[in-house]
């Protein structure tokens, strides 16, 4: 250490305090990185890795750097790669420093604590989440530092906690260090493998310590005053988040003004599998927004509205009155398209007020941010005027909550120029006429620059040197440049400052005097402008709560306008949401598939479910016929109705439900991987259980290839059979996509295999095997013959459904239900039996 330069020792001392972060070490106009940080950063950023002067021991110091005024995209790339970045600034003016400049880390940027737009997706929240537990009670809290949103809840059991965690989708997670070792809780780390994880020691979760953190952040607030007195474990998780803020942001987050507690019973519950299968916010195959329910429904024009819509989809309501209020607002905007379009046009010019407010409160906002705030606030009176014409209760309530902040808008309009520069220290931010001292300094600067122009003309005339130039650089200030060919013509009062290959540079006493006057004024202008800008930014920060409330109201208006436009354009109906049990949908459509541009017209279907004769619907039919689509569309229509949205149907009566479960697709087949007999047995028992459990009386759509299950309608009064209508033509099938009463008589496996593109030779052989099986062609020992050969009469009658023979091949073939075979299963069966013979 003693052999290192003073600056390198300073770097290592500060780096030791932040070993898990890449240290951005401010050196003049650059952030520099050294040693391992430089090696890692240069690789991630794709920038040149060089080295500083060798240490006293002869070793080189790896080095890379980025300009401080354009560091945002570099930081964003590092954070996206999962790295933490510690910003180390110069804590004093280098000109005034005695010895090495003092430096200190002002903040640590982590994946869950970014606030700059370069690191954020406009319509996605960026959550930091903390999870802890006491026995089976799990406390969960999450914060979006960019918007100030801070929520807490408690959940019963690990699976419920994991379901909520996956719904929230945090960028970074805080866990107790004990979660590293406890086998049960290692599941958490497996679920969040693509997230940045920080582990805290157990002392961070001390209740008294967490209470102090809460009181410090929220101006003496208690658990009771925050509404968290019945959520003690969630409050510990909140304490962990606040501890992280203190550690990384020096505890400076004034726009985080409160905690919003919530209970999972306030919303329709959706587990992770249901969210995934229904493709609520991302597609199942590619994980993309486009093609999901969110992708379809999002016609919002603000980033705030986009985030709010996602929350509404993830957390459908359980309160009928709130649902009706949303429906009333959507209906009024549907019936007043002029108001809706005018409102959307005005909202489209509103910037992301939530994130602007976050950066302003964190003293990270630029002059561009204040200009965006001014532009947004200037639209509020017109928005309020449009909404004031509406009579729906929710629209009136939202409009009353929009605060125009006239005085703040006026302040920014007077203080900040229309198109301010990006770099604060370059000046040109404050408008003329805002500050008298600044105006006077600018006059001096302009006069001085005019003098320079006049002096250049004067010197050209005095010397006769037409190529004479007066120029400026940061090293020498103002100087007179004369080419070598004209040096003999210079006057005696010229003082040489620098010799170049082709020119000489001079100053004169008069030039030096004016330089001091002009440059002194320009330095003072920049300092004063920055000071005035900070005053305006602080004035805006003081209105943070008002800005946040207004932003939330605007986001809700944006969502309501979006849902209204969607319902109008797609011909959706207003569902009748009620507390009864009947679910009745007339001409219902899958919202996403109905929106796809396809050569095949979407076929709507009716649905009737209740707690009486239509509690459980068994749906049979071939693969690719539309069973999964039908089930998904019923679930999505129910979910959309409880969002308060209109739904894709001609008419809909939707009961309030507390949970939706879906297991749809090949990977979620009930009894997948079992023998046919086992599968039928399990499916039969599950259907009986769902029907007979009157405590929950779950309304159920049960799609199956087990045709035996259609017999349940005979033994259970609440079970009905339906199938997907199919027409056969010329050995081919046409899917009619219509749900009709009764069970399916065939599975059409071979026809589906043809549609799936299997080779014709395979299709023909499968047909031959199927004929042999259906006609009962047997070989020696009474085994059904799959190979080509003569037919031998069967030696004994077929065993019962759940019987089994002793012979391996006989037993295997007795299990085969031909009508249920998928193309792939048929091929696998052929291969299996060939190996057994």
From Swiss-Prot:
GO terms for cellular component: cytosol
Superkingdom per UniProt: Bacteria
Query: What Pfam family is a match for this entry?
Result: MutS_I
Which keywords describe this protein according to UniProt? ATP-binding, DNA damage, DNA repair, DNA-binding, Nucleotide-binding
Which N-terminal stretch is annotated as signal sequence? none
Question: GO:BP terms for this protein?
Answer: mismatch repair
Q: Where does ATP bind?
A: 621-628
Q: Which GO terms describe its molecular function?
A: ATP binding; ATP-dependent DNA damage sensor activity; damaged DNA binding; mismatched DNA binding
Q: Extract the InterPro entries matched here.
A: DNA_mismatch_repair_MutS, DNA_mismatch_repair_MutS-lik_N, DNA_mismatch_repair_MutS/MSH, DNA_mismatch_repair_MutS_C, DNA_mismatch_repair_MutS_clamp, DNA_mismatch_repair_MutS_core, DNA_mismatch_repair_MutS_N, DNA_mismatch_repair_MutS_sf
- Similarity section: Belongs to the DNA mismatch repair MutS family.
Function, in words:
This protein is involved in the repair of mismatches in DNA. It is possible that it carries out the mismatch recognition step. This protein has a weak ATPase activity.
Can you name this protein? DNA mismatch repair protein MutS
């Amino acid at each position: 250490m003693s052999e290192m330069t003073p600056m390198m020792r300073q770097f290592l001392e500060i780096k030791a305090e932040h070993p898990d972060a890449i240290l951005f070490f401010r050196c003049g106009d650059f952030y520099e990185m050294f040693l391992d940080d430089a090696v890692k950063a240069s690789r991630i950023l794709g920038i040149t890795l060089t080295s500083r002067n060798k240490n006293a021991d002869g070793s080189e110091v790896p080095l890379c750097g980025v300009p401080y005024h354009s560091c945002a995209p570099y930081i964003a790339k590092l954070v996206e790669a999962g790295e933490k970045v510690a910003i180390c600034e110069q804590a004093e003016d280098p000109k005034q420093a005695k010895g090495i400049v003092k430096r200190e880390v002002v903040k640590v940027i982590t994946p869950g604590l970014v606030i700059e737009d370069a690191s954020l997706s406009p319509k996605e929240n960026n959550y930091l989440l903390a999870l802890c537990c006491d026995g089976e009670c799990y406390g969960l809290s999450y914060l979006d530092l960019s918007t100030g949103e801070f929520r807490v809840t408690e959940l019963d059991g690990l699976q419920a906690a994991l379901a909520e965690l996956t719904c929230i989708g945090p960028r970074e997670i805080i866990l107790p260090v004990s979660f590293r070792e406890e086998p049960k809780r290692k599941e958490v780390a497996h679920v969040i493998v693509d997230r940045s994880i920080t582990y805290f020691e157990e002392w961070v979760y001390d209740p008294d310590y967490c209470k102090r953190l809460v009181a410090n952040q929220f101006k003496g607030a208690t658990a009771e005053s925050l509404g968290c007195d019945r959520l003690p474990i969630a409050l510990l998780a909140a304490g962990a988040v606040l501890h992280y803020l203190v550690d990384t942001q020096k505890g400076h987050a004034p726009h985080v003004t409160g905690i919003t507690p919530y209970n999972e019973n306030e919303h329709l519950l959706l587990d992770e599998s249901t969210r995934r299968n229904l493709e609520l916010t991302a597609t199942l195959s590619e994980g993309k927004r486009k093609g999901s329910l969110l992708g379809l429904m999002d016609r919002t024009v603000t980033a705030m509205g986009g985030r709010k819509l996602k929350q509404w989809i993830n957390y459908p309501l359980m309160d009928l009155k709130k649902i009706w209020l949303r429906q009333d607002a959507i209906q009024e905007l549907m019936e007043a398209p002029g108001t809706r379009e005018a409102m959307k046009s005005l909202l489209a010019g509103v910037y992301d007020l939530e994130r602007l407010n976050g950066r302003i409160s964190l003293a990270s906002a630029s002059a561009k941010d204040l200009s965006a705030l001014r532009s947004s606030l200037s639209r509020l009176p017109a928005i309020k005027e449009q909404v004031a014409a509406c009579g729906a209760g929710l629209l009136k309530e939202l409009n009353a909550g929009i605060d125009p902040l006239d005085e703040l808008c006026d302040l920014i309009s007077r203080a900040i120029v229309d198109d301010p520069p990006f770099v604060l220290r370059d000046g040109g931010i404050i408008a003329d006429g805002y500050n008298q001292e600044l105006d006077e300094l600018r006059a001096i600067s302009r006069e001085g620059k005019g003098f320079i122009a006049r002096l250049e003309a004067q010197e050209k005339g005095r010397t006769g040197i037409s190529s004479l130039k007066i120029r400026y650089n940061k090293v020498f200030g103002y100087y007179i440049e004369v080419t070598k060919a004209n040096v003999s013509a210079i006057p005696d009062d010229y003082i040489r400052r620098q010799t170049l290959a082709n020119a000489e540079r001079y100053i004169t006493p008069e030039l030096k005097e004016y330089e001091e006057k002009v440059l002194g004024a320009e330095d003072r202008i920049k300092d004063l402008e920055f000071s005035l800008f900070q005053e305006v930014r602080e004035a805006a920060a003081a209105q943070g709560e008002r800005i946040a409330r207004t932003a939330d109201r605007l986001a809700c208006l944006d969502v309501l306008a979006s849902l209204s436009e969607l319902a109008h354009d797609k011909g959706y109906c207003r569902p009748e949401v009620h507390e009864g049990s009947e679910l009745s949908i007339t001409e219902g459509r899958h919202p996403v598939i109905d929106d796809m541009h396809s050569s095949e017209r979407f076929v709507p279907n009716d649905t009737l479910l209740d707690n009486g004769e239509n509690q459980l619907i068994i749906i049979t039919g071939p693969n690719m016929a539309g069973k999964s689509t039908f089930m998904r569309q019923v679930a999505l229509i129910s979910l959309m109705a409880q969002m308060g949205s209109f739904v894709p149907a001609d008419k809909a009566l939707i009961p309030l439900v507390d949970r939706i479960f879906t297991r749809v697709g090949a990977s979620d087949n009930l009894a997948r991987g079992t023998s046919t007999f086992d599968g039928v047995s399990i499916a039969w028992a599950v259907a009986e259980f769902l029907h007979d459990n009157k405590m929950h009386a779950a309304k159920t759509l049960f799609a199956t290839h087990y045709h035996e299950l259609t017999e349940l309608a005979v033994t259970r009064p609440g079970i009905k059979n339906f199938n997907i209508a199919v027409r056969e033509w010329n050995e081919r099938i046409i899917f009619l996509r219509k749900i009709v009463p009764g069970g399916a008589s065939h599975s059409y496996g071979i026809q589906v295999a043809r549609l799936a593109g299997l080779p014709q030779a395979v299709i023909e052989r499968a047909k031959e095997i199927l004929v042999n099986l259906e006609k009962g062609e047997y070989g020696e020992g009474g085994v059904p013959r799959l190979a080509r050969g003569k037919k031998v009469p069967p030696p004994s009658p077929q065993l019962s459904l759940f019987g089994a023979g002793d012979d391996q091949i006989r037993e295997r073939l007795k299990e085969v239900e031909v009508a249920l075979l998928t193309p792939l299963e048929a091929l696998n069966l052929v291969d299996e039996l060939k190996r057994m013979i």
